[in-house]
Amino acid sequence: MKLRDRPQVRLDLLFTLCRLHREGIAARITRDLVPTRPELLEIVRWEQRATREAGPLLDAHGWLGPDLVGEVGAEAAWWVILLCDKHRLFQQNAHRLLQEAVDQGAAPARHLAYLTDRLLMHDGEPQLYGTQYILNADGSIVRHPVAVPGLLGLRRHRVGLPRSDEARPADLHLMPLTRGPLGAASVSFIG
């Protein structure tokens, strides 16, 4: 594809998504591994802002993919949506839009894998792709249960994720630090 054949990126949307991403990271920088109550409240306030701003963008444009907001904007949109855990309807609507985008080849399947696992985890169901981890109050990290663990490698391969046995503790990025099932905090493996 030649440069002139590429669709024009909506810079206004890109800037909004990158700002929300930056603010979300800032809200998640905590003094300790397990956030304090004031830190959790800041995360909740960020989630409210993010859904208030990103929700209308999804309604107006559908999935915020690379053709609309560039690769950086698409990653930022996915990250923001993934972490708005207290806004299930928002995440479920985004999941539907992301599924359509993946089916059309307009978004990476790995994004759908993470969001699918996130929704399953918060429903108390086993995840499919092994992307979600639980951060316990004592600071220990455990993988949220996986449905049919013997098929995990195949499912991960199909969506472009590395084998789960290749994960090392250093590969765990504590990006989502929000609630898991029963109020536990959760983290995601970034593969």
Where are the predicted features?
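Short, charged low-complexity intrinsically disordered segments located at boundaries
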Residues: 83-90, 127-131, 183-187
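A surface-exposed partner-binding patch
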Residues: 65-74, 158, 162-170
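A short, structure-level motif marking secondary-structure boundaries and short turns
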Residues: 40, 136-139, 181-182
